[in-house]
């Protein structure tokens, strides 16, 4: 077994690549989609369900787990893997995005951020060092540094000041957790808003800190899709080829494939589970809204090309009935299917990269979602 942080590229097709990332709780094959388990669980999904659909890594959120039930409580239980019975790798976001989304409930300063809990209004302080301590208590395999995610309409002056702060925090994070300190990996986060020059500066300064991997943050925050993709394709090639690259909070199946095309390895998004709970399901024929009346007597599975438990067991008519009856089982079955679809998109991408036909594979998916 290679030491945590080892990353091997196994195949390339243009900038798209497959690889293997080693962590303390096992390997992660890339590209990979990470189901979001904000408070330690993927909504409506049990660990056995995740195993069954071949999920390799999930995401948790430092902010939410710190507030409830508390990182020290989780540490006393043996860490997040023991607490939530998920034995495979876990990545924890620093909570920066959630804190900065609080706007009126937080105050920024050089040392960190003061914020009030969205739960009970209690006052808390996150410093770069504190965020690392919390994540080490959680014992996540991949930790993220504290950063500020600016709004899409932030001007150059504010964005430049914000980037200086984010880099300052990244340096302090690296100081408190030097390379080789432990088995937890630490990723830096590229920021810089909508400005290429600032993102280039961010990449350069983060590379000097020699993180175990690099995330592209601050995209899909309200900017037009064309600008998001332009910044993605501009930023990703600047990151070290020998380290994993993570596009935070993005996105649709097509967004993910475009990210892979740009050379990104890791993705997370709440979209598959959130849409599942709203009745929107992804299939090999495009999106399907199970709430529609046309499915009331439809005995077909959601997707005849899908091997997930939901599709192999239940009809569209039954799933529609569950949804309209407000049965909680609908959330689980729909989520199993949507997560399976997203992971199958990833598995197909890996196969296409190895086979040298990734561009054609991406075009096939594009036809489903651009009509």
Swiss-Prot record:
Belongs to the queuine tRNA-ribosyltransferase family. Pathway: tRNA modification; tRNA-queuosine biosynthesis. This is Queuine tRNA-ribosyltransferase. GO terms for biological process: queuosine biosynthetic process; tRNA wobble guanine modification; tRNA-guanine transglycosylation. Catalyzes the base-exchange of a guanine (G) residue with the queuine precursor 7-aminomethyl-7-deazaguanine (PreQ1) at position 34 (anticodon wobble position) in tRNAs with GU(N) anticodons (tRNA-Asp, -Asn, -His and -Tyr). Catalysis occurs through a double-displacement mechanism. The nucleophile active site attacks the C1' of nucleotide 34 to detach the guanine base from the RNA, forming a covalent enzyme-RNA intermediate. The proton acceptor active site deprotonates the incoming PreQ1, allowing a nucleophilic attack on the C1' of the ribose to form the product. Binds 1 zinc ion per subunit. Residues 249-255, 273-277 are annotated as: RNA binding. Zn(2+) binds at residues 306, 308, 311, 337. Its cofactor is Zn(2+). It catalyses: 7-aminomethyl-7-carbaguanine + guanosine(34) in tRNA = 7-aminomethyl-7-carbaguanosine(34) in tRNA + guanine. Homodimer. Within each dimer, one monomer is responsible for RNA recognition and catalysis, while the other monomer binds to the replacement base PreQ1. It comes from the Bacteria. The keyword Isomerase does not apply. NCBIfam families: Q_tRNA_tgt, tgt_general. Its EC number is 2.4.2.29. HAMAP family: Q_tRNA_Tgt. GO terms for molecular function: metal ion binding; tRNA-guanosine(34) queuine transglycosylase activity. The active site is at 93 (proton acceptor), 268 (nucleophile). Substrate binds at residues 93-97, 147, 191, 218. GO terms for cellular component: cytosol. Keywords: Glycosyltransferase, Metal-binding, Queuosine biosynthesis, Transferase, tRNA processing, Zinc. It holds the Pfam family TGT.
